[in-house]
C-alpha cells in the first residue's frame, strides 16, 4: 500500500489509469473485451450498491421504516419533485425512471470515488461525455419523433425580428450541439480537478511531515485543511449528480414541449 501511495504522490494522474485486473488470452481470437479492468470492476460495484440499497434495506412491512429507508425515500422524492417541476405536464412520469437511475449512478460513483485508493468513474471524460452524447441523441430523436420538422422551431426563439433570425439560428444551433459535450464535461472536469487537488495537496503534506519531528506535528494543520477539502468534494459529488439530473430533465422538456 505504501508503494501505491508513493505512486499517487509522485504521479497524481496514475489514480485515473485503467488497469487490467484479470484477462483471458487466446492465440486465435482477441479476448481483450472480456478483461476485468478497474473501470469495469467499479462499474459493477456501483450497480451492486444501488441494487442493494433498494432490495436489502426494505421496510419489511413495518409502519415506521429504518433510517436507511427514510433517506432513500427522501432522495427519491427530491428527484421526483425536481423532474415533475422541470418537465411538467401529464407524462413527466415516463422520464422519471431514467433521470432517477442516472442520478443514483453518478451519485454512488462519486461517493465511492472518495474512498482512498479507489477509482473515479465519472472523472474519465471519454466515458462521461459519451454518456452525455447518448442522452443528447436520445432527446433529439424524441423531439423529432414527437414533432417532426416542427422540432427545428426550437432554434428560432419566439418573437425574434426577421433580420436577426439567421444570426440567432446559428447561435441556438451551436448552443444545442454544445449540450452534448458540456453536460459530461462539467461533471468530469469537476471530479477530475477535485481528485487531482486532493492528491497533490496530500502528497505535499505527506512529504512535509516526513522532514523532522517539528514538521510532523505542524503538518496536522494542512492535514485538517485537506480533510475539509475532502468534505467539500463529497458535497460536490452530490451536487454534480443533482445538476446532471436537472439538466437532463431540462433538455427533455425542450424536446417534448419545444420550449
UniProtKB/Swiss-Prot annotation:
Q: Where are the transmembrane segments?
A: 36-56, 92-112, 125-145, 150-170, 191-211, 216-236
Q: Which CDD domains match?
A: ATP-synt_Fo_a_6
Gene3D superfamilies documented for this protein: ATP synthase, F0 complex, subunit A (1.20.120.220)
**Which PROSITE patterns is this protein grouped with?**
ATPASE_A
Q: What is its main location?
A: mitochondrion
| UniProt keyword terms in alphabetical order | ATP synthesis, CF(0), Hydrogen ion transport, Ion transport, Membrane, Mitochondrion, Mitochondrion inner membrane, Transmembrane, Transmembrane helix, Transport
Write out the GO biological process terms: proton motive force-driven ATP synthesis
Result of mutating residue 171 to M? In strain: D273-10B/A1
Cellular compartment(s): Mitochondrion inner membrane
UniProt-listed InterPro entries: ATP_synth_F0_asu, ATP_synth_F0_asu_AS, ATP_synth_F0_asu_bact/mt, F0_ATP_A_sf
Q: What is the membrane topology listed in the Swiss-Prot or TrEMBL record?
A: Multi-pass membrane protein
What SUPFAM superfamilies has UniProt attached to this entry?
F1F0 ATP synthase subunit A (SSF81336)
Q: Does this UniProt record's set of keywords contain Ion transport? A: yes
Query: Can you tell me which family this protein belongs to?
Result: Belongs to the ATPase A chain family.
What is the protein's name according to its record? Answer: ATP synthase subunit a
Q: Which organism is it from?
A: Saccharomyces cerevisiae (strain ATCC 204508 / S288c)
Q: Show the taxonomic lineage.
A: Eukaryota, Fungi, Dikarya, Ascomycota, Saccharomycotina
Amino acid at each position: 500500500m505504501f508503494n501505491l501511495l508513493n505512486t499517487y504522490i509522485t504521479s497524481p494522474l496514475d489514480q485515473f489509469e485503467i488497469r487490467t485486473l484479470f484477462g483471458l488470452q487466446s492465440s486465435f481470437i482477441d479476448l481483450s473485451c472480456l478483461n476485468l479492468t478497474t473501470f469495469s470492476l467499479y462499474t459493477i460495484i456501483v450497480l451492486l450498491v444501488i441494487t442493494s440499497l433498494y432490495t436489502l434495506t426494505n421496510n419489511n412491512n413495518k409502519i415506521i421504516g429504518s433510517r436507511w429507508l427514510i433517506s432513500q425515500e427522501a432522495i427519491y422524492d427530491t428527484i421526483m419533485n425536481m423532474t415533475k417541476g422541470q418537465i411538467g405536464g401529464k407524462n413527466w412520469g415516463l422520464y422519471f425512471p431514467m433521470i432517477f437511475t442516472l442520478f443514483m449512478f453518478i451519485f454512488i460513483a462519486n461517493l465511492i470515488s472518495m474512498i482512498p485508493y479507489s477509482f473515479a468513474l465519472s472523472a474519465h471524460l471519454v466515458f462521461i461525455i459519451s454518456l452525455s452524447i447518448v442522452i443528447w441523441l436520445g432527446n433529439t430523436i424524441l423531439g423529432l419523433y414527437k414533432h417532426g420538422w416542427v422540432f427545428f422551431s426550437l432554434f428560432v426563439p419566439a418573437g425574434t425580428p426577421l433580420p436577426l433570425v439567421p444570426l440567432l439560428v446559428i447561435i441556438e444551433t451551436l448552443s444545442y450541439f454544445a449540450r452534448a459535450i458540456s453536460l459530461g464535461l462539467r461533471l468530469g472536469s469537476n471530479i477530475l480537478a477535485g481528485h487531482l487537488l486532493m492528491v497533490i495537496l496530500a502528497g505535499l503534506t505527506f512529504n512535509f511531515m516526513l522532514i523532522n519531528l517539528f514538521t510532523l506535528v505542524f503538518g496536522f494543520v494542512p492535514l485538517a485543511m485537506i480533510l475539509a477539502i475532502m468534505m467539500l468534494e463529497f458535497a460536490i459529488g452530490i451536487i454534480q449528480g443533482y445538476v446532471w439530473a436537472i439538466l437532463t430533465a431540462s433538455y427533455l422538456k425542450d424536446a417534448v414541449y419545444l420550449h
